[in-house]
Amino acid sequence: CVFSVGGGDVVRNISPNIVVALDEAKARNLTIIGIVGRDGGYTKKVGDVVIVVPVVDENLITPHSEAFQAVIWHALASHPVLMIEKNKWEGVES
């Protein structure tokens, strides 16, 4: 799963590590899921399922994208099927 603001860009050499990882995933026939900001960049181009966070304010693309991504990864980490251990604060007595 790719969490990125721009999603990588081959031409402008932005986040080349993401580009290489995506190419490797494609070469191995893996499913690519991404949550990205802006237009999604390379992740949007080659990904199988990609959510592009809408731009609300050009000056806040990074924090809006990362905030949305944080909600998703916390939901994944807290999902009962995926959770290995309970969340700390949910297990603390009042």
Task: List PLM regions with ranges.
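Glycine-rich phosphate-binding loops that contact phosphosugars or nucleotide phosphates
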Residues: 1-89
